[in-house]
């Protein structure tokens, strides 16, 4: 089942005023922003040599410590590369150069640490912030996947961008969960009509807010 979050695209956490943003963006850890009990930054965006340089990668191939690339179609021309972003982002960017591409989808799948699901309840809100550079405007579909018991709930938000900051907020309270424990979370960054475009993800963070406690 898929739920679309009604929250505004700017999100509820202002990372620009997060005192711990510098250390967190540089090393993947640091003080948490206000009202958050867990935060994560993908290793691709702070670890040296974390991103594999790949020409014509196969679908399902690992491209970093926590990321895989998925797509359909057999005649796509895709390159994966590391990029040095401008100031204000992480020290490393994950780049995709997409040329001829006839498939229906292209997606970056990020494995989220198990700690994200520990102590989580249905009264939880997640915010995903992504910094991007694109040659041409593009639509991202940010999807949070939550496994509980033997079921997976998905929360999807579409964001259009010409580059810069995009944000999606996923409120688990809008889904009716059956009895069971939360066990796993992963994040998909799906790209609509990616052909003839150069897309660089300069940063990706995921924040957890237990709103039921307030």
What is the meaning of each model-derived region?
Residues 149-182:
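Extracellular carbohydrate recognition and processing domains
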Residues 113-138:
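Extra-cytoplasmic beta-strand recognition segments
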Residues 139-148:
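Short, surface-exposed beta-strand/strand-loop-strand elements in extracellular ectodomains
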Residues 83-106:
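Short carbohydrate-recognition loop motifs
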Residues 98-121, 149-151:
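Secreted extracellular polysaccharide-interacting domains
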């Amino acid at each position: 089942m898929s739920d679309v979050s009604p929250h505004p695209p700017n999100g509820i956490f202002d990372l620009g005023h997060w005192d711990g943003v510098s250390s967190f963006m540089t090393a993947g850890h640091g003080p948490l922003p206000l009202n958050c009990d867990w935060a994560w930054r993908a290793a691709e965006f702070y670890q040296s040599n974390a991103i594999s340089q790949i020409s014509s990668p196969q679908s399902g191939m690992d491209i970093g410590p926590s990321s895989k690339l998925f797509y359909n179609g057999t005649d796509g021309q895709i390159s994966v590369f590391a990029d040095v972003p401008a100031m204000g982002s992480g020290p490393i960017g994950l780049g995709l150069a997409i040329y001829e591409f006839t498939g229906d989808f292209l997606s970056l799948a990020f494995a989220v640490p198990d700690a994200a699901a520990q102590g989580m309840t249905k009264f939880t809100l997640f915010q995903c912030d992504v910094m991007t550079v694109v040659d041409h405007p593009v639509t991202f579909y940010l999807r949070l996947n939550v496994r509980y018991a033997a079921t997976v709930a998905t929360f999807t938000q579409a964001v259009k961008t010409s580059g810069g900051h995009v944000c999606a907020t996923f409120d688990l309270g809008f889904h009716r969960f059956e009895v069971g424990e939360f066990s796993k979370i992963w994040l998909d960054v799906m790209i609509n009509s990616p052909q003839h475009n150069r897309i660089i993800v300069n940063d990706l963070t995921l924040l957890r807010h237990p709103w039921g406690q307030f």
